[in-house]
């Protein structure tokens, strides 16, 4: 378990405002995480290649099948606001 002072320091670095209850709870949780990391550090990983994902994942693509799309009028019919045949949205500054 890490101390409340350490939890408060990490929270300050992350710009998090924690209550006393949250500090106490986070101390236990962070301590458990650090214990898990220490167990991993103790493993003999000689010969184990580094990997970002332990599973051999590949993308599954569907066939590209052209089909009829929505007509402009149908798409604009459900828009809250339109202008000159286009969607009108609030400006983002």
Curated annotation (Swiss-Prot):
Q: Which UniProt keywords apply?
A: ATP-binding, Ligase, Nucleotide-binding, Protein biosynthesis
One example GO MF annotation: asparaginyl-tRNA synthase (glutamine-hydrolyzing) activity
Q: Name the InterPro entries on file.
A: Asp/Glu-ADT_sf_sub_c, GatC
Q: Which EC number applies?
A: 6.3.5.-
A Pfam family that this protein carries is GatC
Q: Which SUPFAM superfamilies match?
A: Glu-tRNAGln amidotransferase C subunit
EC class name:
ligase
Q: Which HAMAP family match?
A: GatC
The similarity comment for this entry is: Belongs to the GatC family.
Quaternary structure and partners = Heterotrimer of A, B and C subunits.
Q: What does this protein do?
A: Allows the formation of correctly charged Asn-tRNA(Asn) or Gln-tRNA(Gln) through the transamidation of misacylated Asp-tRNA(Asn) or Glu-tRNA(Gln) in organisms which lack either or both of asparaginyl-tRNA or glutaminyl-tRNA synthetases. The reaction takes place in the presence of glutamine and ATP through an activated phospho-Asp-tRNA(Asn) or phospho-Glu-tRNA(Gln).
Name of the featured protein: Aspartyl/glutamyl-tRNA(Asn/Gln) amidotransferase subunit C
Encoding gene per record: gatC
């Amino acid at each position: 378990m890490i101390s409340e002072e350490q939890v408060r320091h990490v929270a300050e670095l992350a710009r998090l405002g924690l209550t006393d209850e949250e500090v106490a709870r986070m101390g236990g949780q962070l301590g458990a995480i650090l214990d898990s990391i220490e167990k991993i550090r103790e493993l003999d990983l000689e010969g184990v290649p580094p990997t970002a994902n332990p599973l051999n994942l590949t993308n599954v693509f569907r066939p590209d099948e052209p089909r009829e799309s929505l007509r402009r009028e149908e798409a604009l019919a459900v828009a809250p606001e339109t202008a000159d045949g286009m969607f009108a949205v609030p400006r983002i500054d």
